[in-house]
């Protein structure tokens, strides 16, 4: 254990995903030897994330504005919504060039062991976008105070692109059950070929492109 600010910095880095105690220590010691201007740039970048990044009020993607660039793009297909767990998953799908619709970010997946249920995810916002109603009573008290102005009865398909692991599959099954209450709505899931137990961000572009084009109706 070190003392004072150095140990405090190591402890903070250790809290980051994928950063263990040894990695945190290496990063902290690296920062001891960089130029003051580099420290200032790091401080500015951290402050910009806190003050300059928000969440799109339509799809819950990260954005610098009230509405993200994808939702604001009139050329995107409004009839299709691709549901993902995290904003990083959008970047993976966009790189395939296969999908031209819009997205909805859940903010995670159902995980009872971590006390993450439907109310902790952006599910009620998704249902409002599709038809402005909440078919599942357990979500009723999680409705945003400000209704989304993008409630779109023209949505014809929802693609469930949650991760192909236990939590992602459970989330997809839950959403598929909810979305059956919407008449004439097609609910689909990425086709087989996705590596089971993995995360969407680690799937190569060709595999993901094929999974999108060959998606299965639930």
From Swiss-Prot:
Alphabetized Pfam families for the sequence: RecR_C, RecR_HhH, RecR_ZnF, Toprim_4
Tagged with keyword Metal-binding: yes
GO biological process: DNA recombination; DNA repair
Keywords attached to this entry: DNA damage, DNA recombination, DNA repair, Metal-binding, Zinc, Zinc-finger
InterPro entries the UniProt entry points to: DNA_Rcmb_RecR, Rcmb_RecR, Rcmb_RecR_Znf, TOPRIM_dom, TOPRIM_RecR
Zinc fingers (C4-type) by residue: 56-71
Toprim domain mapped to chain residues: 79-195
Superkingdom assignment: Bacteria
Keyword Cell membrane: no
Coiled coil: none
GO MF terms held by the record: DNA binding; zinc ion binding
Family: Belongs to the RecR family.
PANTHER family: RECOMBINATION PROTEIN RECR
Function description: May play a role in DNA repair. It seems to be involved in an RecBC-independent recombinational process of DNA repair. It may act with RecF and RecO.
Name assigned to this protein: Recombination protein RecR
Organism: Corynebacterium diphtheriae (strain ATCC 700971 / NCTC 13129 / Biotype gravis)
């Amino acid at each position: 254990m070190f003392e004072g600010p150095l140990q405090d910095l190591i402890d903070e880095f250790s809290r980051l995903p994928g950063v263990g105690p040894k990695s945190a220590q290496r990063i902290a010691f690296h920062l001891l030897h960089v130029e003051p201007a580099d420290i200032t740039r790091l401080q500015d970048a951290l402050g910009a994330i806190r003050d300059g990044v928000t969440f799109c009020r339509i799809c819950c993607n990260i954005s610098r504005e009230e509405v993200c660039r994808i939702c604001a793009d009139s050329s995107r297909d409004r009839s299709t919504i691709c549901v993902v767990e995290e904003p990083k998953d959008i970047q993976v799908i966009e790189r395939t060039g296969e999908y031209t619709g819009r997205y909805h970010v859940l903010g995670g997946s159902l995980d009872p062991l971590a006390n993450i249920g439907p109310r902790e995810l952006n599910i009620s916002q998704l249902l409002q976008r599709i038809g402005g109603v909440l078919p599942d009573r357990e979500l009723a008290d999680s409705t945003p105070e400000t209704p989304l102005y993008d409630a779109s009865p023209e949505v014809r398909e929802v693609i469930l692109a949650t991760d192909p692991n236990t939590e992602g599959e459970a989330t997809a099954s839950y959403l598929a059950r909810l979305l059956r209450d919407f008449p004439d709505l097609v609910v689909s899931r990425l086709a087989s070929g996705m590596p089971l137990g993995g995360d969407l961000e680690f799937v190569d572009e060709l595999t993901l492109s094929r999974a999108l084009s060959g998606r299965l109706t639930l």
